[in-house]
């Protein structure tokens, strides 16, 4: 296995002292990069992820180009769902489309047991290739969290208000519980397999869970998240687990009482406010990705975030959501250098 020579990200995730703020970006690998767009002329997303050499190349590009302190495996949160019997297609300009949506108990009952080594060996092979031969920074594996996966499975695709998902949850609580159990077992198994293959940390993407009230989260979602985290920690107690959601500041206190290591926040919450709500966790975030399209505003916001970030150990610079396709790679490199250089100066001053 390649030795990790840059462990800034891991030290920050453990709330240890660092000499500069670590940086990585959600969706740093992919659609904003010319090299990736050229690949997409020939291959679909799923075709790229099924070829370990190509997928590893895409995953590593941002490390080489931007100087980020962690790589995140290039794949989609939908990747494991075909292994459960879900017919999913990624449509350009739309996103994931489910051709056999979940609407009844019978639909839930038919979901297959997910076995990573059988269903997604190419994901594990990509991780092994990166960890063994290619990366000197930590590799982050990830999975979609059950609510977000269920929202796609029930709605049949992207949704603005998740009304089919929430009404299913309210109307069929017992069936919902079975669905959460199945998705939770899949997610835990999937994350453990990624760590076994060489991932240094894992992130749970619950992109749409902010649509729920805290009361609904506590009742319908918290039990399955606790189960996932508990099962991963039982096998890999020292591997950092990151929780990332959008528009979910009202749920931060829920995560404070779980054995998570890092909590991601978006631009709707300040780092100082987040630290008050999750004092035991490292914080990741929280630049609005839209500012990457307005360079002066981006650096202005970055400076403000740095000033907050250095106040306490346990901070990782990231976006509050993914990089947009229109963002110029040069901007990400410039921002990475700025975060590194500026935070190093400020931390030296004490």
From Swiss-Prot:
Tell me the residue numbers annotated for binding substrate.
Answer: 27-31, 46, 76, 152, 207, 321
A GO cellular component entry from the record = cytosol
The UniProt record lists the keyword Phosphoprotein: no
Q: Which InterPro entries match?
A: UROD/MetE-like_sf, Uroporphyrinogen_deCO2ase_HemE, Uroporphyrinogen_deCOase
Extract the PROSITE patterns matched here: UROD_1, UROD_2
User: Keywords, A to Z?
Assistant: Cytoplasm, Decarboxylase, Lyase, Porphyrin biosynthesis
Q: Subunit info?
A: Homodimer.
Describe the task this protein carries out.
Catalyzes the decarboxylation of four acetate groups of uroporphyrinogen-III to yield coproporphyrinogen-III.
**What is the designated name of this protein?**
Uroporphyrinogen decarboxylase
Taxonomic lineage:
Bacteria, Bacillati, Bacillota, Bacilli, Bacillales
């Amino acid at each position: 296995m390649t030795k990790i020579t840059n462990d800034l990200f891991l030290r920050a995730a453990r709330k240890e002292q660092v000499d500069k703020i670590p940086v990585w970006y959600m969706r740093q690998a992919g659609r904003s990069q010319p090299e990736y767009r050229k690949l997409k002329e020939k291959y679909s997303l799923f075709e790229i992820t099924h070829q370990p050499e190509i997928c590893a190349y895409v995953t590593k590009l941002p490390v080489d180009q931007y100087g980020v302190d962690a790589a995140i495996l290039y794949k989609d949160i939908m990747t494991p769902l075909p292994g459960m019997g879900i017919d999913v297609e990624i449509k350009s300009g739309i996103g994931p489309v489910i051709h056999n949506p979940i609407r009844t108990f019978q639909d839930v009952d038919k979901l297959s047991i997910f076995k990573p080594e059988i269903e997604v060996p190419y994901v594990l092979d990509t991780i092994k290739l990166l960890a063994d031969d290619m990366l000197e920074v930590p590799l982050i594996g990830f999975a979609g969290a059950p609510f977000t996966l269920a929202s796609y499975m029930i709605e049949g695709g992207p949704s603005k208000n998740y009304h089919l998902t929430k009404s299913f949850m309210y109307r069929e609580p017992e069936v919902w519980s079975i669905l959460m159990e199945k998705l939770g077992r899949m997610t835990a198994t999937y994350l453990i397999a990624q760590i076994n293959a060489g991932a240094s940390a894992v992130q749970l993407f619950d992109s749409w869970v902010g649509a729920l009230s805290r009361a609904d989260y506590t009742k319908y979602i918290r039990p399955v998240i606790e189960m996932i985290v508990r099962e991963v920690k039982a096998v890999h107690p020292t591997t950092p687990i990151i929780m990332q959601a959008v528009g979910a500041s009202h749920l931060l206190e829920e995560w404070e009482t779980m054995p998570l290591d890092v909590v991601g926040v978006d631009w709707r919450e300040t780092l100082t406010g987040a630290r008050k709500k999750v004092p035991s966790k490292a914080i990741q975030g929280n630049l609005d990705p839209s500012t990457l399209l307005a360079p002066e505003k981006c650096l202005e916001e970055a400076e403000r975030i740095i000033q907050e970030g250095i106040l306490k150990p346990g901070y990782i610079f990231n976006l509050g959501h993914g990089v947009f396709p229109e963002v110029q790679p040069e901007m990400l490199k410039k921002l990475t250098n700025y975060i590194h250089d500026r935070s190093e100066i400020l931390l030296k001053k004490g």
